[in-house]
Amino acid sequence: MQILAPYLSRPDERGGFLGITQESWAEVNFIETRANQVRGNHYHKETRELFFIISGEIEVVIDDLNSGEHLELLFRKGDVFIIDPYEVHTFRTVTDAQWINMLSQAMDPQHPDFHQVAEKN
């Protein structure tokens, strides 16, 4: 997992401009989720994902299948992070939340790079 800082920030009297990423992404998605809901609990073998939180608070749990590292983080409006392949990621919305999700490769419905993990009891 990588937590990103903006590459450019230009506030002025009109509002502001925030540079999120200069990387190329193959797919861009908008996600809206009500408070206290869970999404994810899966990983990808090849796909990297960038997340940009537009509004709300989201608890993110990462379990790296390669290193065994376990992270629990809270993200808020304006936060940007990348999830790498083989990182199981689970999201729980603390509040209603909206975010942008970008994938390094477009999801192929015939052969999705999407691997669900069994829920823990």
Model feature map: region roles:
Residues 65-85:
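Short acidic-glycine-tyrosine-enriched beta hairpin
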Residues 30, 50, 90:
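Short, surface-exposed charged micro-motifs
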Residues 2-10, 27, 94-121:
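Double-stranded beta-helix
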Residues 10-41:
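A short glycine-rich, His/Asp/Glu-containing loop-to-beta-strand
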